[in-house]
Amino acid sequence: YIINVPPRCPPGSKFVKNKCRVIVP
């Protein structure tokens, strides 16, 4: 899912286009 958060993303996520892309199994 994609969430709007600061550059400090949760572990296992990538900061792309001012958004954090988190891949969930």
Curated annotation (Swiss-Prot):
Coiled coil: none annotated. GO terms for molecular function: serine-type endopeptidase inhibitor activity. Belongs to the secapin family. GO terms for cellular component: extracellular region. Disulfide bonds join 9-20. GO terms for biological process: defense response to bacterium; defense response to fungus; innate immune response; killing of cells of another organism. Its main location: secreted. It is found in: Secreted. This is Secapin-1. Keywords: Antibiotic, Antimicrobial, Disulfide bond, Fungicide, Hemostasis impairing toxin, Immunity, Innate immunity, Protease inhibitor, Secreted, Serine protease inhibitor, Toxin. Expressed by the venom gland. The keyword Protein biosynthesis does not apply. The keyword Secreted applies. Serine protease inhibitor which exhibits antifibrinolytic, antielastolytic and antimicrobial activities. Displays antimicrobial activity against bacteria and fungi. Likely functions in the innate immune response to microbial infection and possibly in the venom, as an antifibrinolytic agent.
